């Protein structure tokens, strides 16, 4: 006895894995038409239904777009196109309308994504939380995907991102701190990582932290310790390293109202103060010592930092040590005397 069920063929397009065969068409009394024939595969200037649906599973918005294109470029009916796309006719005809609150949230999300082009949806959610405290990360992710804001992965050489940052001279202590990382190795070839922080105005070394690994949260703790003695800066200047673009570091700058100046990738001259300091640090300290342990490296580097701040003359400070330069500035400001000459070009 011949079964009346249609034959199944594996590997078919997005139709549930089956398509009618010649025998099935003869049994049902209808003509034999495959999906390709119905969609007009052989017609010049037309794409098949498979062409509109090939690839990964589409979101509802993309499915509506695919259905519209099939209706425009193929002889498929609306019912057939919706069935191929896996979307009901009601969902195709009646797209959801976002509420005014969702529209405002989406507009703000797009604005932040355009400002911070390398931030993902979780970091953007951190920025949006103060303005939209009741919105969770799942809704942010949905709006993030709908707006096609996904950050592209860089496969090759880095390209400049963002606008060029002009390097401005600071006018007072704690106006801007510049920071960066310097790497070296112990005698056993184990790597050490040094966080260097410099006050752009006084040229003082605010801190040099030495460890095998320094994360964004570690950087925040070190800066809080330095601020206990010096106070917090108005702004910090960094590169686009993961430690300085981490959620912990961004939250720290927002908590204390600190401006975060990010330089362009591959443009170290935009962070010239810390690059100059790092050159002196490597030439006068790291290249002159062979560290056998992390403890020794910390002791030697701490001694060099004290010598740099208190004894070593600095040309940008008028040939006096940075600590003396800072003390002279505070004295002049306290006495309210003649305007202080920073001596940057003496």
Swiss-Prot record:
Keywords: Transposable element
Domain of life the protein comes from: Bacteria
Pfam (any one): rve_3
Key word Nucleotidyltransferase present: no
Manganese is among the record's keywords: no
Matches recorded under InterPro entries: HTH-like_dom, Integrase_cat-core, RNaseH-like_sf, RNaseH_sf, Transpos_IS3
GO biological process, one term: DNA integration
Name of this chain's protein: Insertion element IS476 uncharacterized 39.2 kDa protein
Originating organism: Xanthomonas euvesicatoria
């Amino acid at each position: 006895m011949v079964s009346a069920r249609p034959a199944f063929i594996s590997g078919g397009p997005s139709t549930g894995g089956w398509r009618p065969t010649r025998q099935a068409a003869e049994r049902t009394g209808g003509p034999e038409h495959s999906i390709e024939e119905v969609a007009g595969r052989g017609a010049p200037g037309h794409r098949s239904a498979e062409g509109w649906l090939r690839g990964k599973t589409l979101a509802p918005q993309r499915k509506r777009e695919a259905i519209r294109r099939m209706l425009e470029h193929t002889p498929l009916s609306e019912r057939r196109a919706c069935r191929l796309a896996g979307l009901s006719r009601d969902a195709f005809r009646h797209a959801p309308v976002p509420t005014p609150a969702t529209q405002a949230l989406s507009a703000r999300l797009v604005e932040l994504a355009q400002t911070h082009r390398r931030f993902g949806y979780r970091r953007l959610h951190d920025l949006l939380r103060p303005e939209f405290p009741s919105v969770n990360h799942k809704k942010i992710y949905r709006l993030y995907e709908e707006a096609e804001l996904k950050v592209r992965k860089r496969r090759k050489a880095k390209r400049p991102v963002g606008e060029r940052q002009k390097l401005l001279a600071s006018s007072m202590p704690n106006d801007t701190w510049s920071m960066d990382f310097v790497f070296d190795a112990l005698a056993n070839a184990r790597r050490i990582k040094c966080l260097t922080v410099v006050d752009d105005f006084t040229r003082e070394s605010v801190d040099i932290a030495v460890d095998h690994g320094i994360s964004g949260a570690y950087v925040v703790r070190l800066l809080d310790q330095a601020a206990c003695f010096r106070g917090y800066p108005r702004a910090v200047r960094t590169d686009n390293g993961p430690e300085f673009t981490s959620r912990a570091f961004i939250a720290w700058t927002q908590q204390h109202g600190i401006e975060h100046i990010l330089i362009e990738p591959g443009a170290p001259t935009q962070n010239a103060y810390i690059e100059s300091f790092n050159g002196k640090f490597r030439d006068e300290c790291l290249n002159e010592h062979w560290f056998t342990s992390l403890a020794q490296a910390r002791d030697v580097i701490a001694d060099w930092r004290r010598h740099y701040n208190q004894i070593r003359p600095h040309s940008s400070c008028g040939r006096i040590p940075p600590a003396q330069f800072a003390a002279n500035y505070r004295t002049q400001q306290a006495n309210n005397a003649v305007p202080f000459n920073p001596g940057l070009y003496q």
